[in-house]
Swiss-Prot record:
Keywords tagged on the record: Cytoplasm, Nucleus, Protein transport, Transport
Lineage: Eukaryota, Fungi, Dikarya, Ascomycota, Saccharomycotina
Pfam families, per the entry: Cut8
S-S bridge residues: none
Gene3D superfamilies from the UniProt entry: Tethering factor for nuclear proteasome Cut8/Sts1
Biased composition (Polar residues): 11-24
Regions crossing the membrane: none
CC annotations in GO: cytoplasm; nuclear membrane
Family: Belongs to the cut8/STS1 family.
Origin species: Saccharomyces cerevisiae (strain AWRI796) (Baker's yeast)
PANTHER family linked: FI02826P (PTHR28032:SF1)
Superkingdom per UniProt: Eukaryota
Protein's GO biological process: nuclear protein quality control by the ubiquitin-proteasome system; proteasome localization; protein transport
Protein's gene: STS1
InterPro entries assigned: Cut8/Sts1_fam, Cut8/Sts1_sf
Annotated protein name in UniProt: Tethering factor for nuclear proteasome STS1
């Protein structure tokens, strides 16, 4: 008989069991029963082995690992808290991206923006920041005090110049009638804006100063428009002190000298104002209206000439 793996044959187990029952009901363990009990103990040890994996290596104390459901998981900030932490540039870029992806909300956003009342001082602060950006973009190899910056400086400074001039034009149009009914505030704001443009560093090549000259021409038109509003308002002409208008006229004369006569037309309109008697004010109003008609005709002719010639396509003043 060869080696038999496993339990004994069932016939022999049955015979041994019967023989044991015949001897006083005393259970006599056989070899097969012992072997079966040994395998049962091994299976029990294998079942208990995974339970003891959490036993500490050195301490010998069993600790249960926390269940995943009891851990606190991190989560992103709510929308309101996230927007509170965003800076100005991030909020602006987010709004621009949303309007680009969803053009239907542009009108709603524009309606809300134009309904806001921005102070003149806030506009001036923004213009001064953009003006400083122009000066900071000047290359170190040339000084801006000589007003002879080269072509390399123009290429470096062009984006900052256009950004400043675009912002300046937008703010001016938002602070003149009918957007702003206070003529004194409009004139004062226009005066400061003109000074900012006049003081900008200029370039040695005349064609590189195109944006400056075009902007000053547009400022000249705005000056003439405000002077026209002043001439039509007799209360301002008679009630206000003439020194206020003389101060504006004196400063405008200085700007005209620095701009090579580009502000000559509004300067002549200012000189035609008479702050004397009502009859003098009325006559000055008539002469001013005639000058304004001539000014509009001249402006139209200049625009036609500019359109016929070659102009920069990225100019904000075309």
């Amino acid at each position: 008989m060869g080696f038999e793996w496993g339990f004994k044959p069932s016939s022999k187990i049955t015979q041994s069991t019967v023989s044991s029952q015949g001897t006083g009901n005393v259970m006599i363990p056989t070899a097969g029963v012992k072997q079966k009990r040994r395998y049962a103990n091994e299976e029990q040890e294998e079942e208990e082995l995974p339970r003891n994996k959490n036993v500490m290596k050195y301490g010998g104390v069993s600790k249960r690992r926390p269940q995943p459901g009891s851990l606190i998981r991190g989560q992103p900030l709510p929308l309101q808290r996230g927007m509170e932490l965003m800076n100005k540039n991030q909020l602006q870029q987010l709004l621009v991206d949303l309007m680009t992806k969803h053009p239907e909300i542009q009108q709603s956003v524009h309606t809300r923006v134009i309904g806001l009342d921005f102070s003149i001082q806030k506009c001036l602060d923004m213009l001064k920041q953009k003006s400083e950006a122009v000066y900071q973009s000047i290359p170190y190899n040339r000084s801006y005090e000589s007003n002879k910056l080269d072509d390399y400086a123009f290429v470096r400074m062009k984006p900052q110049i256009l950004e400043f001039l675009n912002c300046l034009v937008d703010f001016i149009l938002d602070n003149i009638p009918p957007r702003l009914e206070n003529l004194h505030a409009s004139l004062k704001f226009l005066d400061i804006c003109t000074e900012l443009v006049i003081k900008l560093p200029r370039f040695e090549l005349a064609s590189n100063n195109y944006y400056y000259d075009k902007c000053i021409e547009q400022l000249s038109h705005v000056w003439c428009t405000l002077i026209e509003h002043v001439a039509r308002d007799r209360i301002i002409l008679l009630a206000d002190n003439s020194s206020v208008w003389k101060s504006h006229m004196t400063r405008l004369q200085v700007y005209n000298e620095h701009s090579n006569g580009l502000l000559e037309r509004p300067l002549q309109l200012f000189k035609s104002l008479d702050m004397g008697s009502p009859s003098a004010a009325s006559s000055s109003t008539l002469s001013l209206q005639e000058s304004i008609i001539y000014h509009h005709d001249t402006m139209t002719a200049n625009e036609n000439n500019n359109n016929s010639g070659s102009a920069a396509t990225d100019s904000p003043f075309n």
